[in-house]
């Protein structure tokens, strides 16, 4: 049996990210064999990962990957903001985005894809859960592509290239790709990050959302006591204002505060055919922690 030295424990810890005492125990169980110790930790980690799978994951990162006329965006969640600053987690998000770029935005296909370690994305995720000690989940993915033109990506306040908490893809069709078109795409990404449009054009506005808005506007207009014919005109004017707020092509361009997005794109000789905006954790209800209950549980009391 090899001697369990501090250097050996440190080497195992650096290789796996596991705790010092766990590494020492693993080496003892494996009689000092490094590979066997790693396997022991992985087995232990798999058990831990299963226990953590029920925890809420509302933190994490958004990642993008681009290849000229195609781009992918993913959201990978974790339990705490601390994990988002972990380099191994950031690297994993990058890898998942690149897998999505290759295989598309079906989550099962992404999880079956391979990462540089040789593992599948699903296995790499399980390994990361065991190593870092938090539940994690690949929440969603989106891939946009065009036959001719560009799909630009933008990450707001990126922690590193292509990684942050808000990401946007913008698909522009044009006769050819150009640096100017890519720049416009990134500017559209910046605009979308700031304005949060709900639809690309008027035709793609959610009919139910539109009807709810119209019903509210009608009731508001009727309070004025004006005739129905005038109320109808008032409502139509306010619906146009609603479109300017939620429809990307109808919005005022944030870079000059005057032009419509549609005119900016038209002037560039392009057509904006799609966009996607991911904001980390949107729609996820975070769990409220009961600190007193946690302390009581840890102490074995109720």
Swiss-Prot record:
GO terms for molecular function: translation elongation factor activity. Pfam families: EF_TS. InterPro entries: EF-Ts_dimer_sf, Transl_elong_EFTs/EF1B, Transl_elong_EFTs/EF1B_dimer, Transl_elong_Ts_CS, UBA-like_sf. It is found in: Cytoplasm. Residues 80-83 are annotated as: Involved in Mg(2+) ion dislocation from EF-Tu. Disulfide bonds: none annotated. SUPFAM superfamilies: Elongation factor Ts (EF-Ts), dimerisation domain, UBA-like. Keywords: Cytoplasm, Elongation factor, Protein biosynthesis. Its main location: cytoplasm. GO terms for cellular component: cytoplasm. Gene3D superfamilies: 1.10.286.20, DNA helicase RuvA subunit, C-terminal domain, Elongation factor Ts, dimerisation domain. Belongs to the EF-Ts family. Associates with the EF-Tu.GDP complex and induces the exchange of GDP to GTP. It remains bound to the aminoacyl-tRNA.EF-Tu.GTP complex up to the GTP hydrolysis stage on the ribosome. This is Elongation factor Ts. It comes from Gluconobacter oxydans (strain 621H). The gene is tsf.
């Amino acid at each position: 049996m090899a001697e369990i030295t501090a250097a050996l424990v440190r080497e195992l810890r650096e290789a796996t990210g596991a705790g010092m005492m766990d590494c020492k125990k693993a080496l003892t169980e494996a009689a000092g064999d490094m590979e066997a110790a790693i396997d022991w930790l992985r087995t232990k980690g798999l058990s831990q990962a299963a226990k953590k799978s029920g925890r809420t994951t509302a933190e994490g990162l958004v990642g993008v990957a681009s290849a000229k006329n195609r781009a992918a965006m993913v959201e990978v969640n974790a339990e705490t903001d601390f994990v988002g600053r972990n380099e191994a987690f950031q690297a994993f998000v990058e890898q998942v985005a690149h897998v999505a770029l290759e295989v598309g935005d079906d989550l099962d296909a992404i999880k079956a894809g391979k990462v540089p370690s040789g593992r599948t994305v699903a296995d790499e995720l399980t390994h990361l859960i065991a190593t870092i000690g938090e539940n994690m989940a690949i929440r969603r993915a989106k891939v946009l592509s065009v036959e001719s033109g560009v799909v630009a990506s933008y990450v707001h306040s990126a922690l590193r290239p292509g990684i942050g908490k808000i990401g946007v893809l913008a698909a522009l069709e044009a006769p050819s790709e150009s640096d100017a078109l890519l720049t416009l795409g990134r500017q559209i990404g910046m605009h979308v990050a700031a304005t949060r449009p709900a639809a690309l054009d008027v035709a793609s506005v959610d009919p139910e959302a539109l009807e709810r808005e119209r019903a509210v506007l009608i009731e508001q207009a009727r309070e004025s006591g004006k005739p129905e014919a005038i109320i109808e005109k008032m409502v139509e004017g306010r619906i146009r204002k609603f479109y300017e707020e939620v429809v990307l092509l109808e919005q005022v361009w944030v870079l000059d505060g005057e032009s419509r997005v549609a005119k900016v794109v038209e002037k560039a000789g392009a057509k904006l055919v799609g966009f996607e905006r991911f904001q980390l954790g949107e729609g996820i209800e975070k769990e409220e922690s009961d600190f007193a209950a946690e302390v009581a549980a840890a102490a074995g009391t109720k």
